[in-house]
């Protein structure tokens, strides 16, 4: 059962995040912990990575907003974090950040589903380029259904 103050907390966190150049991803309240823990996850509005400094900066602002709102009368721990990146790459920033990382590309070719594994080289307007044993293979972007990070095998 969600905490009864969760909607108010989400509204407060969203307004605080927006005012500081962030986007709210998730708010959770863990009442089974002593003291209670409030976890807020944020992303940068411009899509760039959230740093520890960003978390510290937002933590101070969120703490002030919580204290001013007087939503909680009991002690709590405030945790600010970023959800990080999932396995799948979507944005241009993802492809820049993970250049050289091992990936698996799923794509369609002549009505069959294919998979190709290699090191991410780049993504252009027309193709996704991967390095397979030192050779660059280009896969048309419109055929690509998924690009996901994998663990290197050794």
Swiss-Prot record:
Belongs to the RimP family. GO terms for biological process: ribosomal small subunit assembly; translation. It is found in: Cytoplasm. Gene3D superfamilies: RimP-like superfamily, N-terminal. Keywords: Cytoplasm, Ribosome biogenesis. It comes from the Bacteria. GO terms for cellular component: cytosol. The lineage of its organism: Bacteria, Bacillati, Cyanobacteriota, Cyanophyceae, Synechococcales. Pfam families: RimP_N (PF02576). Its main location: cytoplasm. This is Ribosome maturation factor RimP. Required for maturation of 30S ribosomal subunits. The keyword Hydrolase does not apply.
């Amino acid at each position: 059962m969600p905490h009864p103050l969760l909607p108010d907390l989400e509204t407060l966190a969203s307004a605080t995040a927006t005012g500081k150049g962030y986007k709210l991803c998730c708010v959770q309240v863990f009442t089974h912990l002593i003291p209670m823990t409030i976890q807020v996850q944020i992303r940068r509005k411009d899509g760039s990575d959230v740093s520890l400094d960003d978390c510290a900066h937002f933590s101070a602002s969120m703490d002030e907003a919580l204290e001013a709102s007087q939503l909680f009368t009991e002690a709590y721990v405030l945790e600010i974090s970023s959800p990080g990146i999932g396995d799948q790459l979507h944005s241009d920033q993802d492809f820049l950040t993970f250049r050289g990382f091992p990936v698996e590309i799923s794509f369609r070719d002549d009505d069959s589903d294919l998979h190709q594994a290699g090191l991410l080289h780049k993504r252009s307007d027309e193709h996704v380029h991967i390095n397979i044993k030192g050779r660059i293979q280009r896969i048309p972007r419109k055929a690509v259904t998924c690009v996901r990070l994998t663990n290197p095998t050794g």
